[in-house]
């Protein structure tokens, strides 16, 4: 069977599956990050960092398998970031599986509250942002950090710059850029929450759009903690992202119906919205 080529958006290869109620796992292999784990698709196993948005089974069900398979392959223990409110319960989940599986299931579990940051490396960090689902949930923004020589030191020799550094002078400015945002499951309320500005400025926004047509009302979508595509149109001017990847479509839709709904999006969304249809 021919391997399907990864989708590439704004320079980021993106892989994964997302079918509403069935499974969601979005993978950014160049960042070594997966968002949610679904049923643990094979490509997720090689990602060192896993960010969980909420504890519904279609988003967290494959968690023990993710850790167990990394152990089987003798990979380093992964780092798993979960909402702080469910950290203790996730710890209990692993204790049960250790007893069942008679294995260590080594991993690093981190509880992150909304607004808190997790440092992946010097030039990459992730912050949790507020989302609105029927249970405790949160999204994540990935930021890159670049260091630029301050204007007043441009033109100095290498030795002069080295001497300044040695003497403790801060010679660079930090340029922090929101690169990728992931919503998990949420209503459209996350769009109008003022604290979520960076999610709407990230180069790539991965957001749910569970419902696409008039057979389901906006009210129904909101009642179940989800987004109807018409709400994305209504908030179109708020999205400053270079690209938006829609995920988590209801299993009731076909690939053609999904693609038709996306291609019908008006400006300013037209041409910068993509759909993840793997598995449909």
Curated annotation (Swiss-Prot):
CDD domains, alphabetized: RNaseZ_MBL-fold (cd16272)
Instruction: List, separated by semicolons, the cofactors it needs.
Output: Zn(2+); Ca(2+); Mn(2+); Mg(2+)
Q: What is its main location?
A: cytoplasm
The UniProt-reported impact of residue 62 to V is: Reduced catalytic activity, but no effect on dimerization and tRNA binding
User: What keywords are assigned to this protein?
Assistant: Calcium, Cytoplasm, Endonuclease, Hydrolase, Magnesium, Manganese, Metal-binding, Nuclease, tRNA processing, Zinc
Effect caused by changing residue 248 to L: Loss of dimerization and catalytic activity
**Disulfide bonds, paired cysteine numbers:** none
According to the UniProt entry, its GO molecular function terms are: 3'-tRNA processing endoribonuclease activity; metal ion binding
**Record's cofactor remark:** Besides the tightly bound Zn(2+) ion, TRZ1 requires additional Ca(2+), Mn(2+) or Mg(2+) for pre-tRNA processing, while bpNPP hydrolysis occurs without addition of metal ions but is stimulated 2- to 3-fold when free Mn(2+) or Zn(2+) ions are added.
Where is the protein situated, by its record's location annotation?
A: Cytoplasm
Reported effect of changing residue 203 to I? Loss of dimerization and catalytic activity
Signal peptide feature range: none
Look up the coiled coil feature and give its residue ranges.
Answer: none
Catalytic function, reaction form? Endonucleolytic cleavage of RNA, removing extra 3' nucleotides from tRNA precursor, generating 3' termini of tRNAs. A 3'-hydroxy group is left at the tRNA terminus and a 5'-phosphoryl group is left at the trailer molecule
- InterPro entries for this protein: Metallo-B-lactamas (IPR001279), RibonucZ/Hydroxyglut_hydro (IPR036866)
Cellular-component GO terms for this entry: cytoplasm; nucleus
Q: Which GO terms describe its biological process?
A: tRNA 3'-end processing; tRNA processing
Outcome of altering residue 226 to L? Loss of catalytic activity, but no effect on dimerization and tRNA binding
Q: What is known to happen upon mutating residue 58 to A? A: Loss of catalytic activity, but no effect on dimerization and tRNA binding
Q: How does it assemble?
A: Homodimer.
Q: What does this protein do?
A: Zinc phosphodiesterase, which displays tRNA 3'-processing endonuclease activity. Involved in tRNA maturation, by removing a 3'-trailer from precursor tRNA. Can use bis-(p-nitophenyl) phosphate (bpNPP) as substrate. Involved in the processing of small nucleolar RNAs (snoRNAs).
Q: Which family does it belong to?
A: Belongs to the RNase Z family.
The name this protein carries in UniProt is: tRNase Z TRZ1
Native species:
Arabidopsis thaliana (Mouse-ear cress)
């Amino acid at each position: 069977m021919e391997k399907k080529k990864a989708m590439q958006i704004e320079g980021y290869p993106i892989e994964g599956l997302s079918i509403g109620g069935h499974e969601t796992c979005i993978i950014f292999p160049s960042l070594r990050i997966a968002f949610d784990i679904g049923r643990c698709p094979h490509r997720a196993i090689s990602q060192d960092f896993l960010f969980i948005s909420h504890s519904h089974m279609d988003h967290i069900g494959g968690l023990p398998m993710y850790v167990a398979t990394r152990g089987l392959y003798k990979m380093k223990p992964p780092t798993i970031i979960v909402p702080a409110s469910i950290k203790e319960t996730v710890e209990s989940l692993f204790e049960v599986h250790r007893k069942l599986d008679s294995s260590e299931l080594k991993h690093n579990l981190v509880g992150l509250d909304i607004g808190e940051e997790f440092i992946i490396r010097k030039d990459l960090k992730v912050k949790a942002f507020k989302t609105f689902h029927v249970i405790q949930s949160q999204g994540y923004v990935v930021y890159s950090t670049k260091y630029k020589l301050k204007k007043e030191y441009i033109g100095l020799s290498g030795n002069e710059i080295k001497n300044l550094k040695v003497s403790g002078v801060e010679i660079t400015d930090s340029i922090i850029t929101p690169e990728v945002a992931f919503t998990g499951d949420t209503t459209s309320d996350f769009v109008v929450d003022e604290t979520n500005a960076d999610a709407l400025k990230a180069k790539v926004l991965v957001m749910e759009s569970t419902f696409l047509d008039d057979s389901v009302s906006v009210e129904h979508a909101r009642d179940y903690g989800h987004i109807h595509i018409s709400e994305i149109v209504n908030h179109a001017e708020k999205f400053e992202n270079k690209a938006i990847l829609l995920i988590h479509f209801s299993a009731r839709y076909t690939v053609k119906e999904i693609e038709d709904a996306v291609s019908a999006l008006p400006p300013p969304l037209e041409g910068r919205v993509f759909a993840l249809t793997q598995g449909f």
